[in-house]
Amino acid sequence: MRALVLAAGKGTRMKSKIPKVLHPLSGRPMIEWVIETAGKVAQKVGVVLGFEAELVRKALPEWVDVFVQGEQLGTAHAVMCAKDFIEPGDDVLILYGDVPLISENTLKRMIEEHRKGADVTILVADLEDPSGYGRVIQDGDKYRIIEDTDLPEELKSVTTINTGFYVFSGDFLLRALPEIKNENAKGEYYLTDAVNFAEKVRVVRTDDLLEITGVNTRKTLVWLEEQLRMRKIEELLENGVTILDPATTYIHYSVEIGMDTVIYPMTFIEGKSRVGENCEIGPMTRIVDCEIGNNVKITRSECFKSVIEDDVSVGPFARLREGTILKKSSKIGNFVEIKKSTIGEGTKAQHLSYIGDAFVGKNVNVGAGTITCNYDGKKKNPTFIEDGAFIGSNSSLVAPVRIGKGALIGAGSVITEDVPPYSLGLGRARQVVKEGWVLKKRKEE
């Protein structure tokens, strides 16, 4: 089985410089949804590109065969551009890059039906308002498809539509393609004409509107996004996740969340994030591509491409940037930013700190206002803080620098040299007190 994805269209009605198939749906380009599903049912996958072909090609996996349709002259013309992909002894599944939610189950039903002996198998649906769609007309055991623009008045009441999804016998398709003409209202080469040439046609029906909805406008894309969002929320609710306000919660379809986790309002969980069991996430929190363990609490914070182990507390108002690893039972508090750093088990950084390019050991106390000065104007430098160290408030650690095990840094210090284990590090001017100075100054005035 081969699958050919037609994705050459510009998407004029999207009013965008971005190719239509690259617009995201639940965090992934539309065409990525189609390629993934195609790869589950077919041994080879090909894609026909057109508008901004090179840009779309970069978004495709390397194992996909790519063909280019220089001028968009219809669906049959697109398939002709990939003629070398079609093998006489193999079946071909036709999919579309802007119809992203076609299901694996439906495609398997089509393939199974086709293998009962057909030149072509069509996926059809019945719509209350079929306007704009080609109609599937049955005459005994024969079927033909008429495009909406070419439909005679007496057939406009037919509600069975052609979804555009087909399985063709490779032998039949190679014979039919040269016979297709562009004698229609739009002057295009329609793949539906190949169906009309077929002697053996089989039909599979779907009643799932989502999987046959094509995206031609941003309005449709937003509608699909909302339907997919609610499907995901319903799935999570059924699997033991509490979502306090579904109306303000946005969770991408690829996200995994464990049971007894509570999601508070205004929370966004995106990408390939995985959240463990018995967590509290939100409110007003955004999580992107993170691995989160069990019993984690994150509130009013942002976390990007980070790993958060069990029993960790984050926030409020913390920011975890890419490359952050928070070990078990660590605590990150308000207005703390961490970038490309590992925070050891039981370590606390609870107030107003920046930790970047650092390796912090176990049970370290990072005092309020601590800054790792990692950038020297040319490159980023590392800071090492070993187990059990105590960093006093308002300290600046000028990297590269190492704070030894159990060392103590006095509050307000600027540390520019390594501090050995169990040592006191001070880097500040001695306090000066001038008794009675204020009263004396007032008298002078």
Swiss-Prot record:
Catalytic function, reaction form: alpha-D-glucosamine 1-phosphate + acetyl-CoA = N-acetyl-alpha-D-glucosamine 1-phosphate + CoA + H(+); N-acetyl-alpha-D-glucosamine 1-phosphate + UTP + H(+) = UDP-N-acetyl-alpha-D-glucosamine + diphosphate
What cofactor does its activity depend on? Answer: Mg(2+)
The EC code for this enzyme is 2.7.7.23, 2.3.1.157
Q: Does the keyword Metal-binding apply?
A: yes
Q: State which pathway it belongs to.
A: Nucleotide-sugar biosynthesis; UDP-N-acetyl-alpha-D-glucosamine biosynthesis; N-acetyl-alpha-D-glucosamine 1-phosphate from alpha-D-glucosamine 6-phosphate (route II): step 2/2; Nucleotide-sugar biosynthesis; UDP-N-acetyl-alpha-D-glucosamine biosynthesis; UDP-N-acetyl-alpha-D-glucosamine from N-acetyl-alpha-D-glucosamine 1-phosphate: step 1/1; Bacterial outer membrane biogenesis; LPS lipid A biosynthesis
Give the subcellular location.
Answer: Cytoplasm
Residues bound to UDP-N-acetyl-alpha-D-glucosamine are: 6-9, 20, 69, 74-75, 96-98, 134, 147, 162, 216, 321, 339, 354, 365
List the residue ranges forming a coiled coil, or say none.
Answer: none
> Active-site residues?
H351 (proton acceptor)
Region: Linker; residue ranges are: 219-239
Protein name in UniProt: Bifunctional protein GlmU
